């Protein structure tokens, strides 16, 4: 999972993620917006979930972050899974609306984002 942090002309941090993980970048850009307290909450949840069967989620304005002890999912709130309308054996995946990654990879991006934001 590749990522890049940039500052726009006004100094706002923007995240760009590799193909298949774009929604994670959108989550940082739309929900985090340099709010390090939110990142603290996510990191605390990850520590609590490690080695357990529980899951945790944080719904935002545009995106919801869900995680368990192994995986992180970020999805657009407008995305609805209409299982009855899907053909048997078909999975719904929209790279503009849903991204999955491992918890450790996600926490590496969180740490790198935090470091970049603090370099002002």
Curated annotation (Swiss-Prot):
Q: Which domain of life is it from?
A: Bacteria
Under InterPro entries, the record lists: UPF0231
A family per Pfam: UPF0231
Per the similarity annotation, which family is this?
Belongs to the UPF0231 family.
Name under which the protein is recorded: UPF0231 protein YacL
